[in-house]
Amino acid sequence: MEQAWRWYGPKDPVSLSDIRQAGATGIVTALHHIPNGEIWRIEEIKKRKTEIENAGLSWSVVESVPVHEEIKTQTGNYQKWINNYKQTLRNLAQCGIDTVCYNFMPVLDWTRTDLAYELPDGSKALRFDHIAFAAFELHILKRPDAEKAYNQEEQVAARTYYDKMSAQDITQLTRNIIAGLPGAEEGYTLDEFQTQLDRYKDISSEKFRTHLAYFLNEIVPVAQEVGIKMAIHPDDPPRPILGLPRIVSTIEDMQWFVETQPLPANGFTMCTGSYGVRSDNDLVKMIEQFADRIYFAHLRSTQREDNPLTFHKAAHLEGDVDMFNVVKALLNEEYRRLNQGETRLIPMRPDHGHQMLDDLRKKTNPGYSAIGRLKGLAEFRGLEMALKKVYFNK
């Protein structure tokens, strides 16, 4: 696999030099300074690509070209944003970039309740606390009909949790959930957030699928024409939240996805940490069933807690994800492609490392500190080497 690393551009505390020293060769990045929906101009793409190449690295994957909210709701200027998206793909292809990761999650990108959950060894991780999230929905945001999403026991636990919160706790939880995270291009106040949610009140999962289908049927033929592989990222977490439709969460969703738009350019980002939160998702089966459509891998593991809807980021080779067999399945597909004459390795990046060691004293992007990902990348490099020696180099 191609060892890649997510970089948030010139303002990222982790520099390109740091990344190269970590052993990565590919960069996963985006033009974060361009507003959602606007065209990425060739000169802007080339400027960023040159910056990366001057550091001895290559721009391997775009993550992400954001999908404008009006595309998701099919309102306003959605056709304009789709046309802009097509032009961005053409411009990326002209600059030699061939893989685009994106998501179709409504309103929020990945969501956590705690961005600095302390583990027993003193390192810090991202965490999603189901009851804390319920307290936010029911008692801070006060989302209409939110109680329908929780049983009586959960509602009581959420009330108890909320009653113990200080004003600072409420502010911090709210900020964690709605103020925006790396990769989520927009942040919201509470009122703005509820306004965004209200735009989906009449959009069921079935209707949302028709919106995604329309987007795919507009975009994927262009990607196919210009040689770009589109790799949709799963919902994170992979279940309904905030009354919003979530339609990229299961193997059944993946099957619908490829049947809806069967062109080869229409593929997946295999994010083991997102899909793996659900105990009913068999990651190895997913990889094997859709192997030829996996164009990018996010490798991380999560640990479900006593409440199985609560989870935190585990060490990369620990937790609930069977990383040994996940990586083996990805290598099986990579070798199949190589044997058929393809030369492009599957780009992989270590996702959401723990904040540890010297990074505990630094300001970092949540989930994207250097040392935790350095550790993860080294572990994956070793795992891949061992698997290749035992199973593939015969």
From Swiss-Prot:
InterPro entries in the record: Man_deHydtase (IPR004628), Xyl_isomerase-like_sf (IPR036237)
Alphabetically ordered keywords of this record: Iron, Lyase, Manganese
Broad class of enzyme this protein falls into: lyase
GO biological process, one term: D-glucuronate catabolic process
Domain of life: Bacteria
Cofactor: Fe(2+); Mn(2+)
Keyword DNA-binding assigned: no
Protein purpose: Catalyzes the dehydration of D-mannonate.
Protein name: Mannonate dehydratase
Organism per entry: Haemophilus influenzae (strain PittEE)
Higher taxonomy: Bacteria, Pseudomonadati, Pseudomonadota, Gammaproteobacteria, Pasteurellales
